[in-house]
Amino acid sequence: YGEITHTLNAIREGITHVPDATLCLNADCSLTSSLADDVPNKVVWFGVDVPIYKETAFELSDAVYCIHCKTEYEYDYRTYSHLGGFRCPKCGYHRQTPQVGVTQVVRTGADSSDIVLNAFGHNHDVHINLPGGYNIYNAAACVAAAEIVGIDEDTAVDALSRFECGFGRAEQFELGKSKARMMLVKNP
């Protein structure tokens, strides 16, 4: 599978074969945002407009330097690692304004999160029936993708509070006298 830039370049190559496809891209990721460069595809951007947590790990960044000019990025805020309000002080490459953006993280918990989501100019109070900051991103991505395929935004937003994980994804179980949660993740 290889490193992240190999995967990014494979996706970039694939996009060249589908110029009529609408891309659903994370505005907070300087790497995936670059997929919109120099292609005719329409893009629906999603992102998180505010920090998710009070403290986060920035030293784990997958993208410290600008993908275009190799200058270190500056940030208005970060959500996690290299995700957030990035901008390059040298060439001007920057975060796009998302059409679907989390404007407030009301609560993050062990089982769920509550957010305010602005989707195409409409604010929604959203309960995400899954834990984790990455699921806040997933929720925004789902509403953006739903728009692309013609599902109305109210239906998409409502589904977020009713969604339940499949086997092994945030599954809770008892292990002896203790409670445990299984979090399966994948890396490139």
Name the predicted role of every residue range.
Residues F58-V64, L130-A141, F167-G168:
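Short glycine/threonine-rich catalytic loop with a Thr-x-Gly-x-Asp
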Residues D125-G133, K179-R181:
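A short glycine/serine-rich beta->alpha loop
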